[in-house]
Amino acid sequence: MLAKFAALAALVASANAQAVCSLTAETHPSLNWSKCTSSGCTNVAGSITVDANWRWTHITSGSTNCYSGNEWDTSLCSTNTDCATKCCVDGAEYSSTYGIQTSGNSLSLQFVTKGSYSTNIGSRTYLMNGADAYQGFELLGNEFTFDVDVSGTGCGLNGALYFVSMDLDGGKAKYTNNKAGAKYGTGYCDAQCPRDLKYINGIANVEGWTPSTNDANAGIGDHGTCCSEMDIWEANKVSTAFTPHPCTTIEQHMCEGDSCGGTYSDDRYGGTCDADGCDFNSYRMGNTTFYGEGKTVDTSSKFTVVTQFIKDSAGDLAEIKRFYVQNGKVIENSQSNVDGVSGNSITQSFCNAQKTAFGDIDDFNKKGGLKQMGKALAKPMVLVMSIWDDHAANMLWLDSTYPVEGGPGAYRGECPTTSGVPAEVEANAPNSKVIFSNIKFGPIGSTFSGGSSGTPPSNPSSSVKPVTSTAKPSSTSTASNPSGTGAAHWAQCGGIGFSGPTTCQSPYTCQKINDYYSQCV
């Protein structure tokens, strides 16, 4: 993800504070999800918390803000240790202040929420395991599925669902000054090594703090916080991408200044993490009719997103595979339509070919590539769900042409290059929202199924501004045939309308997922 800015209006100051106050009670909204096995799924009674960077932070002895607008009040504290001692984070009023609502297994995130004392912009939430710990997910060799409604998110917005290698307790045990922990949403990190957090590693980030020139609620400090990141879903109703971001150091770690790299530093590639990642955006890969309103995956209504993290015989991450389910039909991810880049999933060979075809800087392999990402996925990662706008690049990297002058790989969506300006998005689309629901996690093949009527749609032919000298015709949404006899491990091997191989390479067998999709397992 290119950036994830915290934004909260002046009267509700934001900070990743380490102390805790109780002027507002903290009650986590409940959010159910399902843990699945080959025999079925069981309900898990979970909850969510909002990130500490959105919370009201004030002096421990009263209600005076420690941070207002985009500046620290240095008359109250001026050093990292001093602010950690004198300031506290408080409880959250989830619906009225942040526009966060839950119902059963559904989470709704409102973009702009006008409360009695503040106007809140966006939010970042985490799935909890009890009151004091984040829920951990070991994704390698497993499958993660959720429903999403992006019909209320247009150009310049990102309704994101992703995983990061945060400490499950929010860093409370590692950093003894942190008295808030996961309960209050502390400990965030990602592959951008963000420097906009007010507290990192149990101390404040006030030293060297520079207010943003285009965000009235944010700034950057000397320190950043880094860890591995797996973007399962970055999307609005125009475009979507899924992207692994490996780091040479997997777990949360603090960085300093431009050595952080990422969006917040002058040297983007100077840190421990791959800020760009290896992304699969169907539009960018040459299919302009696969995702969007009225397209193969129709974003005007809810659909299901399935992501599989497939291991090879050595136990390393070999492939990140994507399916959609809509109106009871399984839809395979679109095939690449870029010369020299084949496939419809993320593999090491796909990433190598894409970097070459687009002429991108290959920091992905410098940071360990897919194998290093797999090491992070083998350990517990924290689920993040957010909605945000982009003060760094207006979200053009997701849904428009970026860089704006064009070139190989620049065409990412239909939004104008003049779109996504945060001040305009906030003023013109305040009621935007994203809804995540029906989260499921389990072994591959355990979390999704399709209906029993109709025929699955195919990917129609499409055209896109050329990313290489010659564009290939679009492929239909069927798995590529492997070499040898039968379909390869995890490939499609049957279903209504499927014309490929119906047997599997030894020792795998063809397992029916539903009437429209069978898979070699």
Curated annotation (Swiss-Prot):
GO molecular function: cellulose 1,4-beta-cellobiosidase activity; cellulose binding
Domain CBM1 stretches: 485-521
Region (Disordered): 447-486
EC number: 3.2.1.91
Gene Ontology, cellular component aspect: extracellular region
Ranges for region Linker: 451-485
Keywords: Carbohydrate metabolism, Cellulose degradation, Disulfide bond, Glycoprotein, Glycosidase, Hydrolase, Polysaccharide degradation, Secreted, Signal
Reactions the enzyme catalyzes: Hydrolysis of (1->4)-beta-D-glucosidic linkages in cellulose and cellotetraose, releasing cellobiose from the non-reducing ends of the chains
Endpoints of the signal sequence: 1-17
Xref: InterPro entries: CBD_sf, Cellulose-bd_dom_fun, ConA-like_dom_sf, Glyco_hydro_7, Glyco_hydro_7_sf
PANTHER family in the cross-refs: 1,4-BETA-D-GLUCAN CELLOBIOHYDROLASE B, GLYCOSIDE HYDROLASE FAMILY 7 PROTEIN
Protein name: Exoglucanase 1
Gene this chain is encoded by: cbh-1
